[in-house]
Amino acid sequence: AYDTNRGLKQYGGLHTQADFDRIKAQIAAGNEKVVSAYNILKNAEYAQPTIQTYPVETIIRGGTTGQNYINAARGATMAYQNALRWKIEGNTSCAAAGIRILKAWANTCKLVSGDSNWALAAGLCGYEFAQAAELLRDYDGWGNNGFENFKKWMLTVWYPGCIHFLRGRNGTWENIGNQGGIRPGHYWSNWPLCNALAVISIGILCDDVFIYNQGMSFLKYDQVGTFRDPRTDDLILNDGCTEFWGNLIVTTSESELETGAYGKLGQMQESGRDGGHAAMALGLAVDIAH
């Protein structure tokens, strides 16, 4: 939502205060399923305020040696899970731990690198760090300019790579080598979905409606050409790259494009690849929609 007086209306990232109020009420009422689920989080290794993170100056994903991106993935998860505990149970030790972890990474990390797989680290870890910080924005333990410095880190280390990938797809935008260019869009949907989600999350965190709308534009309007439907001899519009809503979920909704013998398959672009990638694409799409 956009307020012309001050940019984004701040409802939060993946969670709103109403979400946390509902969870706390369910726990207080003794809802066994909610209490059981929350205890899993509360007892998780990464949700403990004593957990340690190990930031690196250069995050590397892909290549033959030196991969260390898992440190960033773990660090973001630690901050996020501790932030959840603070929002739900009011444990200030968890809030302080989340901020300690986020500041450690912001004070150390300067680059996301590797082979072409760097884009996965940028998108997945970028949105996780942004969402963790969003949960902790109202905690008063950031210190002098701590929150502002963290936002600058997201804008200088994470945002440029994510938007660069969405614009250029590591140089494969037209995909000339595949069928003479008639099937543009080399990357399957997990790649652009996580980077679009990172851009959107950074826009929310930084109260920047322009960056937020950049991420949304790739989902709403991105179009890169045509491809040939193997079932016919006709060229049909490729409604953008693989994160574009019309291309991503057309077979799960009512659409004039799904009226033939194949029917409505209820599948996404990653469906049929393997369970992990298909579930991940759905999860990323749901997070974006949320």
Please tell me what each predicted stretch does.
Residues 204-290:
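Long, repeat-rich segments with strong aromatic
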Residues 136-139, 202, 206:
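Residue-level signature of the C-terminal ends
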